[in-house]
Amino acid sequence: MSPGQDATLLERSIKIAFVVALYWVVSISMVFLNKYLLSEVSLDAPMFVTWFQCVVAVVTCFILGELRSYHPALEMFPRFAFDTHVAMKVLPLSLVFVGMIAFNNLALKFVGVAFYNVGRSLTTIFNVLLSFFMLQQRTSMPALLMCGVIVAGFFVGVNKEQEQADLTMAGIMYGVLASLCVALNAIYIKKVMPFVDNDMWKLTAYNNMNAIFLFLPVITFMGEIPDIAASEDVYSGNYWFLMTVAGLLGIAIGLVSMLQINVTSPLTHNISGTSKACAQTILALQLNDESRTATWWLGNVFVLGGSLGYVLVKRAEMKRDLEKVPSSADSKA
């Protein structure tokens, strides 16, 4: 290998390491900051916190769209001009999106960060079930076996978390509902993308704009308005700073996820996400000075290992299907 190739390889390795580290920092920071806002501040208004993050997302998308002509890196962000017709087309997805982020934050409020990944681990299972019932797509036996490993890890984790920590049934149910909504969200995104010119950032803007209006009756129904009006936190600049940072991290995670996929691959992105979840669990236990039994850790290993195994199985199946296409074309010729 020539010196020039060595230098190029080193530069690429440094770039990959930087992007992966950035993804970890943004993702873990977002989880811990949301946990703080939902559990540690005196204002108990999880739907209001989620609503404000949607406001930050829309404002950020609008600003980035207006700045797109000032730098080539910003050209990926479209100018956001609200169209009622498009918003109505996106509305079914927005309803699922509201459920997803609402249940996600409620799950984070009622469970510890260390258990958060286990509590949200059934997304893959719901993906398989919804793909079968809504899209008539069957799942192979190896993939189903990996799903079985995930389910086993979930129940082991729930059982041991109940023994060692203050885990409520509400926390478990919110985690399950969040997983269901994440799976539904993935299906509806595919249906809605043509209405936004297959532009993910335009979809983000419309989705969050719809969510701003959809969350208002939810906030009222949950009785959060009197709590907001009576809270001293809303008069604290530090509170609004942290709320804004949390909203910006929500946008940033989409950016760094795409960046990580671009400089590596979708498979590496999934492996990085699994590794990050493990590091996040260890960090949460260290920061809270907590310990868990070997069986609790076994549940986590099942969840993370099953999730990674599912990704590897699906990748192998996709590769095999792609290899069949040229061979079938050759046989017809």
From Swiss-Prot:
It is found in: Golgi apparatus membrane. This is GDP-fucose transporter 1. The keyword NAD does not apply. GO terms for molecular function: antiporter activity; GDP-fucose transmembrane transporter activity. Keywords: Golgi apparatus, Membrane, Sugar transport, Transmembrane, Transmembrane helix, Transport. Pfam families: TPT. GO terms for biological process: GDP-fucose import into Golgi lumen. The chain crosses the membrane at residues 13-33, 45-65, 95-115, 139-159, 169-189, 211-231, 239-259, 293-313. It comes from Monosiga brevicollis.
